Every structure is written in C-alpha cells, then in structure tokens.
Design a protein with these regions (language model features):
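Sec-dependent signal peptide recognition
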Residues: 1-9
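Bacterial N-terminal signal peptides
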Residues: 8-17
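N-terminal acidic, glycine/proline-rich low-complexity segments
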Residues: 22-271
Length: 271
C-alpha cells in the first residue's frame, strides 16, 4: 500500500521561510510545458541558478508541450546557461493534448531567430528517460517539479518494466521519488478552470488518484500574487542577447509585469 499527502502551499507558507540547507544537492526533474506561458522560462532560469549554487542536481528536463520548437528552445537554454549536459526529453506530439498556439510562440521566436546557436543534442522520449534517470537514483531521493500538464506523469505511472528497471511505473515512482511539487489547480472558491489541469483532465485525475508519494500543490492564486517586474528584466545586461529577455519580449508587448506561477513550485521543490 502507498500512502500520500496532498498539501497546498496556501496551507504551508512556512516552507518558504527558515528552511535548513540540505546536506547534499536536491535531485530535481523539471516537468514543463515550455511554449505555453512564459513563466516556464524564468522557472528554468531559477533552476540553473540553483544548480550554479550547488543547491540542486538537475537530472532531467521533460517537456509536455506539443510544439516542435519547445525542445530546441530548452536545448538552447541549456547551452546558454552552460549546462548542455542536462538531458532533455519530450513526448510525441500525438500523445499530448492538442492546444491552441499563439503564433508565433515565444519558443519559436527565440529558437528560430538565428541569434543563438542551434543545439545538436538529442531529445529523448520522456517516459523512457524518466525510467532511466529514476532507476539510477537512490531510493526516495528525487523531487519532481511539474509546472505544466500532467500528461507525461500519467504515462510514467502507466509504464511497463523495461531494461532500466523491473518495476512498473507506479512502483518505480514510489521507490525513487520523494516528493512531487506542482503548479496547478485553484482552491480559492472562484471555480477557476486552471490551465494545467483542464487541458488534460484524465491525466490530472490519474496523477492525483494514483501518485504514490506526497504532492505539494502551488495553486493559481499563490503565483498570481507574485510578479516578475519588467524593470528586473531590463537590468539583465551581462549578455548582449539573452534568451530569457527575448522570450518575455516575444510573449507579450513590452513593458509588462508577469505572474510567477511556476516559480513558486520550483521554490517549494528546492527550498
């Protein structure tokens, strides 16, 4: 039998204060829908900074957005931030929910701009790479930070034993994962149909119903009160061209301040 707790950050704000430094870097897998809202880019920027500081080991970046430019954009970010060795994975577009696309998406605007070198790194299948990475980790050591759809996590739960592990997906997760933090849902009584849940409701039901570890949820109303200011973006001046700045400028007409939904899930998973 598996037991789990599902906790909202609304009821656990103490996680953001007085945290004790971990004895070793937190092992993180980042699950993103890169190409939808632009806050995924800043969330990934945070993870690179945590890795620079030795606070995390970023094991895998897994994408659940069916945009042909999403994975190239993530590879580009890896290269720009000096972490080209971090594996990138994605599910085939036909296995992901169809979504309306903002044309052009910021991932296309940046990746196809020619400003940044294209990467030749391989993009792996998300579930296969999840299984490979998880199987190699110590038991109960991995924190998955999910800031997009739950499609890949459902596929992971449903996965069969393979060359990496004799365990089926749910049992592999139970053995290797310590915590799932996610941005998703809304619990303020406004009956808000939050994007990460409503776009793939069967996956959300499967994850909330069958996930075998504790889940910490940062809902819409938490990140909706925190803003990344345009003034902070303007102060990034250490590179003549920066993919973070270009992504924000491509997403909406500048200047604008943007909510920090995904960043709260990252902070909860690390801190």
């Amino acid at each position: 039998m598996f037991s789990k707790t599902i906790l909202s950050l609304i009821a656990s704000a103490m996680l953001f204060t007085g945290s004790v430094a971990a004895a070793e870097p937190v092992r993180i897998i980042f699950e993103t829908d890169m190409g939808n809202d632009v806050d995924d880019v800043l969330a990934l920027d945070m993870l690179y900074k945590y890795q620079d500081a030795g606070k995390i080991q970023l094991l895998l970046i897994s994408n659940n957005k069916g945009n042909a430019y999403s994975a190239p954009f993530i590879h580009l970010m890896n290269d720009f931030y000096g972490w080209s060795g971090i594996p990138v994975a994605s599910s085939p577009a036909e296995l992901l929910p169809r979504q309306k696309e903002k044309q052009p998406s910021y991932v296309e605007a940046v990746a196809a701009s020619g400003v940044f070198p294209a990467s030749s790194a391989e993009t792996f299948d998300s579930v296969e790479k999840y299984r490979q990475v998880l199987a190699a980790q110590p038991d109960r050591s991995v924190v998955i930070v999910s800031v997009g759809l739950l499609s890949n996590l459902k596929r992971l739960l449903d996965s069969a034993p393979d060359r990496y592990s004799e365990l089926p997906g749910r049992e592999l997760v139970a053995r290797k994962v310590r915590l799932l933090t996610m941005m998703g849902g809304s619990f303020d009584g406004q009956r808000r149909r939050e994007f990460n849940i409503r776009i793939d409701i069967p996956a959300a039901r499967a994850v909330f119903g069958r996930w075998p570890t504790d889940i910490l949820v940062s809902p819409w109303e938490v990140g909706g009160q925190i803003f990344y200011r345009c003034a902070a973006l303007d102060k990034i001046g250490y590179a003549a061209q920066h993919p973070l700045k270009m992504a924000y400028a491509s997403y909406l007409p500048m200047p604008y301040d943007r909510e920090c939904w995904d960043q709260t899930a990252v902070m909860a998973g690390v801190e």
